[in-house]
Amino acid sequence: LVYKDEQGNPDYRLYRKAVADLDVSAGKLLNILPKDLELFHTGSLALVPEMLDVLIPVITELKSRGVKISIDVNARKGVEVNHQKYIEAIAKFVACADIVKVSDEDLLITNLYGDPNTHVQSMLNSMENGMVVLTLGEAGSHFISPKFNIQQDIYKAKSYGDTVGAGDTFFSAMIAQLLRDDALYQEADQEKLGYALKFGSLAAAINVAKVGCH
C-alpha cells in the first residue's frame, strides 16, 4: 500500500510473506530467461534473506554467460522482520553486481550513517570491477567506480506531481542508455557514462512532473 507523507513523498506499508512473486526456484527462473539476455536487473523487495538461495545461483550462472548484473537497493522498512538479516542479504547481493544504485535514504535505512561516499567505497571494495550510482535527492547524483566519480545536478521539473517511481525511472533510463552505448563497464568512454547519468536525471524530472510513476 502506498501513502504520501506531508511533503508529498511516497510512504509504504508492505505485506511480503507468502506472496506470488517470491514463489520461484532458481531453475525455473533460469529456464524462462531469454538466451540472448544482456542484463539481469533485480532489487528492492527481492533483496530479502529467503531469496538468497534463489537469486545468487541465478546471478552466478548468468555472470558465467557474460550477462551484466544490475541491483537497485531501494531499501524499504518493514520488508523483513529481522532487519539485520535484511541488511546482510542486501550486502551479499551488492557484492555480486556489476552496477548498483543506492540512495542516501537507502543508506540510512540499512544503518549506514555518515558520509555516503565512504559507504559507496565499501560497496565497490566488495564488488568485482563494479560501479555504483549514488543518488542524493536535491543534491543530484554521482556515478562512481575506482576509476571515476561523475557528478550530475538534478533537473528541476516545471511542475511537481510527486516522486513516486522517480528512482526507478532514473535508473532504468540510465541503464538503457548505457546498454545502447555499449558502456556498462568501468573502462567505457566517460563522456558516454556521463551522458547516461544525465539521461537518467532528465527522465526522473519528467516523472516528477506528473502524479504517479510514468
Language-model features: where?
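Acidic, amphipathic alpha-helical patches
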Residues: 29-30, 90, 120, 160
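Conserved N-terminal subdomain of the carbohydrate kinase-like
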Residues: 1-44
